[in-house]
């Protein structure tokens, strides 16, 4: 049980370091790996847009090998029906949007973006309370094919 939590922590730390290293350069950024990234709610107009999957070429090269290994490991282990876990992301993201819209609790008080990578969903943006943050994470975690959720939401009352 401790391994998934350790993996989650290490992944979050890695992404934080990659983002910080990239923030210091003026290199052009793009969504090199075509990871789905979309705004789910728009209730806090002053919430800044998160960087999402925008990478420099150097960042993309640094991540490429690890993405290949992580992408195919779930299929080799028999946990995925598709040969690469990144193939799920474009199927999952519409379900995330649909679940948030159908729930109805978050539209007027949050501005949230979702980033999908290898069956994991990163929630980024602003919520009105810790309870909203927890409820949104729980909602997304319950969606089919979602393996994990990284909650990077900031509480902005």
Whereabouts are the PLM-identified features?
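N-terminal targeting leaders
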Residues: 2-157
